[in-house]
Amino acid sequence: MPHQHKGIDKAKILTEALPYIQRFSGKTLVVKYGGNAMTDPELESSFARDIVLLKTVGLNPIVVHGGGPQVDSLLKRLGQVSDRIDGMRVTDEATMEVVEMVLGGSVNKSIVNLINQHGGRAIGLTGKDGNLIRARKLLMEKHDEQGDIKHIDLGLVGEVVGIKTDVLEMFTQSDFIPVIAPLGVDESGNTYNINADLVAGKVAEALGAEKLILLTNISGVLDENKNLLTGLSTQEVDRLIATGVIYGGMIPKVGCALDAVKGGVVSAHIVDGRVPHATLLEIFTDHGVGTLITNRLHAKSEH
């Protein structure tokens, strides 16, 4: 009988997922992969299985990955110092060589290999391939003690100007799963290091994706009592930022999700990547495992 109960439980999970599979079949979703999910073997495996399953049941997943800790590790081994300003890496030419080597090389190919080992057909890209990510230099704005805005030069740190969607559509219309390293190139051929959340958001916007999923090391967006907010409208997010409930390091991540939704992505999800199979749970279950952000005023029912 215990085995029968397990079978019934699995059947219930599948029947709960079915309406979501039908609803999202043929839709594109962009998943930002980073944090603990990239360093824990069990989480790595569950992430790869999630991506392969999404492709198998008819969705078009696109992966954008980070890799800051891996960059830090190689810089340390090489004896190079990399400064940060408000969490942004100051990237000179020597640092950029390491960033490109790690993100476009070892990290990208290890994710491709991971997905392929679990039955997928992943293909690795950087923003330089086919001019996929067109970029320009990012000038960071900060207020000085007098309240005046000053621009800070972060070196070869960029922002996204445009996405060549035809490069990605070539793969999503086939069996391939694109895996993108967040490197961009400008009109002069200069390479830029770009925040992976921002790249994922801009890719999702450009493709008119159904969903943007940001895997993080936290449970999602929390209220003033540190309780998880499972669903938010864009108006509610604006209010929570204005009142200081969303603050610090969460502002850029939530801002990226907010911009994507305002730019045409149907919904954005800030998801706890420490939970095995977090991506599947967020998409294919009634409650999800993170915070959903959508233009609709009643977001909680939209998982």
Curated annotation (Swiss-Prot):
Disulfide bond entries: none
Predominant cellular place of this UniProt entry's protein: cytoplasm
GO cellular component, as recorded: cytoplasm
A GO molecular function held by the record: ATP binding
Alphabetical keyword list: Amino-acid biosynthesis, Arginine biosynthesis, ATP-binding, Cytoplasm, Kinase, Nucleotide-binding, Transferase
Provenance organism: Acinetobacter baylyi (strain ATCC 33305 / BD413 / ADP1)
Binding residues for substrate: 67-68, 89, 193
Lineage summary: Bacteria, Pseudomonadati, Pseudomonadota, Gammaproteobacteria, Moraxellales
InterPro entries: AceGlu_kinase-like_sf, AcgluKinase_fam, ArgB, Asp/Glu/Uridylate_kinase, NAGK-C
Protein name as annotated: Acetylglutamate kinase
GO process annotations (BP): arginine biosynthetic process via ornithine; L-arginine biosynthetic process
UniProt record similarity statement: Belongs to the acetylglutamate kinase family. ArgB subfamily.
